[in-house]
A protein has these predicted regions:
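A short, structured surface patch at a secondary-structure boundary
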Residues: 59-116, 120-129, 233
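Extracytoplasmic substrate-binding proteins
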Residues: 26-29, 36-37, 47, 131-213, ...
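Secretory targeting signatures
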Residues: 1-31
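Ligand-binding pocket segment of bilobal, Venus flytrap-like solute-binding proteins
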Residues: 225-227, 244-265
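Alpha-helical, coiled-coil/dimerization segments enriched in small aliphatic residues
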Residues: 215-243
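Short helix-initiation/N-cap motifs at beta->coil->alpha
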Residues: 43-45, 99-111, 130, 152, ...
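A local structural motif
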Residues: 47-54, 92-101, 230-241
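Solvent-exposed loop/turn segments at secondary-structure junctions
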Residues: 63-66, 84-87, 120-121, 126-130, ...
């Protein structure tokens, strides 16, 4: 047999073996994505199955980090995070955690992310600046579950906390948090229930983008309107379209709000 024929046979064999390897990985990965008795459903209505609580997690926003703290989840499971956690005063646990993206809204450094070998990537579910579907399409085929949870919308906050609580075996901690929520809500409701609408304070909630450009306000579809109304206030710009919208400074002055607030970054 000539050297040329031998080399051709070796090359063909390697191609076949690589093809079989890729097929086996793809098949086993698909099976692992759909197996396990620990089942949670995220805020995109995607079901995720786990054999056990994940031990390698990447988180992108401080909302998720705060909820993990509230539930007393061991933060040693965090193997990667965004630049939103780089304030050592607030997040000292994250000083040595690898950076996988500059912020919760920025592009992912996929090489850095894959180097973390995460089981789960926790991301916003419905934030307009994050394409959660595209992220899922890229990460889940390589075995990384994309868990979509917002943690900043009050009407879904308890359900989302419950998802993490179930995933990490912190149901009792969640129960205590929910009881405290209910106690505070009842106290506020009792205090404001007798207040006439004409006496409720008018509130303008500005988006933090207003700090660097023309005013941007939160409207009726934003998470803030629900909180403002629960607290006994009235969002002056609730009827404007969109989640956020630009307004003139004159519009804010003309509204003559009793309270002017900025949302956090």
């Amino acid at each position: 047999m000539s050297n040329g024929h031998f080399i051709a046979i070796v090359q063909a064999t390697l191609i076949v073996l690589c093809t079989i390897g890729v097929w086996h990985y793809s098949t086993s990965n698909d099976e692992s994505q759909h197996s396990g008795n620990l089942v949670v459903v995220d805020s995109n209505d995607i079901e995720h199955r786990f054999e056990e609580s994940p031990s390698r997690v990447v988180i992108t926003n401080t909302y998720a980090g705060t909820v993990m703290r509230m539930l007393d989840i061991d933060l040693d499971v965090i193997v990667g995070a965004s630049g939103d956690f780089q304030d050592e005063t607030i997040w000292p646990e994250f000083t040595e955690i690898p950076l996988v993206q500059l912020s919760a809204h920025s592009e992912i450094d996929f090489e850095a992310l894959l180097d973390c070998y995460p089981d789960v990537y926790i991301v916003f579910a419905s934030n307009g600046m994050v394409d959660t579907g595209a992220i899922r399409d890229k990460l889940e085929p390589v075995g990384i579950k994309v868990l979509a949870l917002d943690f900043y919308k009050y009407d879904t906050l308890e359900q989302e906390i419950a998802v993490l609580a179930k995933l990490f075996g912190k149901e009792q901690e969640a129960k205590e948090i929910f009881e405290e929520f209910e106690e505070i809500e009842n106290m506020v409701e009792e205090r404001i229930s007798g207040i006439d609408d004409s006496l409720k304070p008018n509130v303008v909630m500005e988006h933090h983008a207003s700090l660097t450009r023309d005013p941007v306000v939160l409207t009726g579809t934003s998470q803030w309107t629900d909180i403002i109304e629960r607290a006994g206030g009235i969002n002056v710009f609730a009827d404007l379209p969109g989640h956020t919208t630009h307004v003139d400074m004159e519009a804010i002055i003309d509204a003559n709000p009793d309270v002017l607030m900025f949302d956090g970054i």
